[in-house]
UniProtKB/Swiss-Prot annotation:
Active-site residue list: D246 (proton donor)
GO molecular-function terms, A-Z: S-methyl-5-thioribose-1-phosphate isomerase activity
Domain of life the protein comes from: Bacteria
Gene transcribed to yield this protein: mtnA
Name of the featured protein: Methylthioribose-1-phosphate isomerase
C-alpha cells in the first residue's frame, strides 16, 4: 500500500532548496501555480500570516525552516544570536495563533538548540531538525492514510461516498495529506466511489484547493455549496465525513476550519460517521477543552469584497477562521500513533504519552 500511495502523489507545497524556502502560493490556485522564494524569517512569517501557505502541518514545517533562515541572519549579524532569535520565535508564533503544529514545531526547534553539543555546527543542526520535521510529517500522513481506510473498510466494505471540508491534503502538509490522504488511499483501494467537497468560505479551500488536488489525480469529486451539505447528507448516501484538524484539546474537542462544527452536527443528525485525521502533533494536552483553544479572526475585507465589487458598505463583519467541534460529535480521531474512537481525555492522554520501544 505504501508504495502505491507514494506513486500516486502528485502535489507538493513546500520545498527546501539552496538554502531558501520555496512555497507554492495557495492564494493563486488553481488559476496560477506560482512559487514564492523566502530567504528570511520576515518573508516566511508573512507567507504564513497571509495564507500563501496554510494548513496546520504545513505552517509548522514552514516555521521550522523560517527559524533556520532567522538563525543564518542572526549569525551573520554577529551579535547575541540566542537572545535575538527569541524575537524570531515570537514573530513566527504570532503569525497564526490557532495551529497547534506551529507551536509544536517551534518548541521542537528550541529543544534542539538547547541540546546542542559544543562541537556541533548550530546552523547545520537546526537545518537538519527542520528537514526531519518535514520528513516525519509526510511519513505520518502515509501511516494515517492506511489506518483511516482500514477503519472505513471495517465498517462497510463496498465503495462509498465521502464528504470532506476545507483542505487537508498535500497542500496543507508535508506531503500526501491527512483527510485527503485517507481519501486517496480509499480511492486506490476501490473503497471510494465519489468525494463531495464543501466550498469552504470565505477562502474557498474546498473548491479551489481540494477540488484541484483530487481532480489532478482523477478522483471523482463533486463541489457543493456549504449551505447544501446537510441536504447532501440526507440525499446522497454519504457514509463518512472526513476532515483535518488545526488543534485538538486534551478532551478531544477539535478546532477546524469554520463550518466544521455545523457539519458535525448535521452528520450526527443524519447518522453519518465523523472522522478527524490529524498528526499527534495537533494534540495539545495543555488545552483542557475547546474553550481554551485561541480562535483566530481575520479582517472584514475578506467578506466585504466580491470579485472587486464592494458588498454591503457600512456593515459589521464577524469573520472567525475556525470553530470548535465538541468531542461528543466525533466518532474517531486518526493519528499516526493510533486510532481513538469516541475520544475523551483519558484516551488522548494514553495515546500521546504512550512509550515507544523504538
Amino acid at each position: 500500500m505504501r508504495e502505491r500511495l507514494l506513486a500516486a502523489e502528485k502535489v507538493t507545497a513546500i520545498r527546501w532548496q539552496g538554502g531558501a524556502l520555496h512555497l507554492l502560493d495557495q492564494r493563486l490556485l488553481p488559476s496560477e501555480e506560482r512559487w514564492l522564494a523566502c530567504d528570511n524569517v520576515a518573508q516566511v512569517a508573512a507567507a504564513i500570516r497571509d495564507m500563501a501557505v496554510r494548513g496546520a502541518s504545513a505552517i509548522g514545517i514552514a516555521a521550522a525552516y523560517g527559524l533556520v533562515l532567522a538563525l543564518e541572519e542572526r549569525l551573520a549579524e554577529g551579535g547575541d544570536w540566542e537572545m535575538d532569535l527569541e524575537d524570531d520565535f515570537l514573530t513566527l508564533a504570532e503569525a497564526r495563533p490557532t495551529a497547534a503544529n506551529l507551536f509544536w514545531a517551534l518548541n521542537r526547534m528550541r529543544e534542539r538548540l538547547l541540546c546542542l553539543r559544543p562541537e556541533e555546527d548550530v546552523l547545520a543542526a537546526l537545518e537538519a531538525e527542520a528537514v526531519a520535521i518535514h520528513d516525519s510529517d509526510r511519513e505520518a500522513n502515509l501511516t494515517m492514510a492506511q489506518q483511516g481506510i482500514e477503519l472505513i473498510r471495517r465498517h462497510q466494505g463496498n465503495a462509498q461516498a465521502l464528504l470532506t471540508f476545507g483542505n487537508a491534503g498535500a497542500l496543507a502538509s508535508g506531503g500526501f495529506g491527512t483527510a485527503l490522504g485517507v481519501i486517496r488511499a480509499g480511492y486506490l483501494e476501490g473503497m471510494v466511489e465519489r468525494v463531495y467537497a464543501g466550498e469552504t468560505r470565505p477562502w474557498l479551500q474546498g473548491s479551489r484547493l481540494t477540488g484541484w488536488e483530487l481532480a489532478n489525480e482523477g478522483i471523482p469529486v463533486t463541489l457543493c455549496a456549504d449551505s447544501a451539505l446537510a441536504h447532501l447528507m440526507k440525499t446522497k448516501g454519504i457514509t463518512w465525513v472526513v476532515v483535518g484538524a488545526d488543534c485538538i484539546a486534551a478532551n478531544g474537542d477539535m478546532a477546524g476550519k469554520i463550518g466544521t462544527y455545523q457539519l458535525a452536527v448535521s452528520a450526527m443528525h443524519h447518522g453519518v460517521r465523523f472522522m478527524v485525521v490529524a498528526p499527534s502533533t495537533s494534540i495539545d494536552l495543555n488545552l483542557a477543552t475547546g474553550e481554551d483553544i485561541p480562535l483566530e479572526e481575520r479582517d472584514a475585507d475578506e467578506w466585504l469584497d466580491f470579485g472587486g465589487t464592494p458588498v454591503s458598505p457600512g456593515v459589521e463583519v464577524f469573520n472567525p477562521v475556525f470553530d470548535v467541534t465538541p468531542a461528543d460529535l466525533i466518532d474517531v480521531i486518526v493519528t499516526e500513533r493510533g486510532i481513538v474512537e469516541r475520544p475523551d481525555a483519558a484516551k488522548l492522554a494514553q495515546l500521546v504519552c504512550r512509550k515507544r520501544l523504538h
